[in-house]
């Protein structure tokens, strides 16, 4: 029997909406990365973009365990000498919670050219509203261990 290779027309993309309220950031990122890559599908191929669209709402209410809120830092560099800036996650979640969630998910995607396409299917919103109701997204529940 020959190995099945999916064609671009065979890819069926769905829309999922995830509520990030009180969900641990790492668990949210790993589940979202699986959906974006399409690893939950039986027709998964690592060399193709098979993933679904993912909408994350309430990114401002995401949880971090332990002392990560104060100790974990996010770094950026402007490209100029001495242009390294860092901010802890408490300040990052207060100023731009969308960036904190996107950064965690981007770190769990493969480091190749497909990552940009897969990250393009991610829509993150700080509040409970999103403009994608016309796509009829399905609710995706993340099983949470008690904190």
UniProtKB/Swiss-Prot annotation:
The encoding gene is rplM
Q: What does this protein do?
A: This protein is one of the early assembly proteins of the 50S ribosomal subunit, although it is not seen to bind rRNA by itself. It is important during the early stages of 50S assembly.
Q: Which cysteines are joined by disulfide bonds?
A: none
**Record-linked SUPFAM superfamilies:** Ribosomal protein L13 (SSF52161)
Q: Which family does it belong to?
A: Belongs to the universal ribosomal protein uL13 family.
Its recorded name reads Large ribosomal subunit protein uL13
Record-linked Pfam families: Ribosomal_L13
Q: What is the lineage of its organism?
A: Bacteria, Bacillati, Actinomycetota, Actinomycetes, Micrococcales
Keyword line: Ribonucleoprotein, Ribosomal protein
Q: How does it assemble?
A: Part of the 50S ribosomal subunit.
């Amino acid at each position: 029997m020959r190995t099945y290779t999916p064609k671009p027309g065979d890819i069926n993309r769905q829309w999922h909406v995830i509520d990030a309220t009180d969900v641990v950031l790492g668990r949210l990122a790993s589940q979202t990365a699986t959906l974006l890559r399409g690893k939950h599908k039986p027709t998964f191929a690592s060399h193709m973009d098979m993933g679904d669209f993912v909408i994350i709402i309430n990114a401002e209410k995401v949880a971090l365990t332990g002392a990560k809120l104060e100790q974990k830092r996010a770094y950026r560099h402007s490209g100029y000498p001495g242009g390294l800036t860092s901010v802890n996650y408490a300040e990052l979640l207060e100023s731009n919670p969308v960036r904190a969630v996107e950064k965690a998910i981007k770190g769990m995607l493969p480091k190749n050219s497909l990552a940009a396409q897969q990250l393009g299917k991610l829509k993150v919103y700080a509040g409970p509203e999103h403009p994608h109701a016309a796509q009829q997204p399905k609710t995706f529940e993340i099983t949470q261990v008690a904190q």
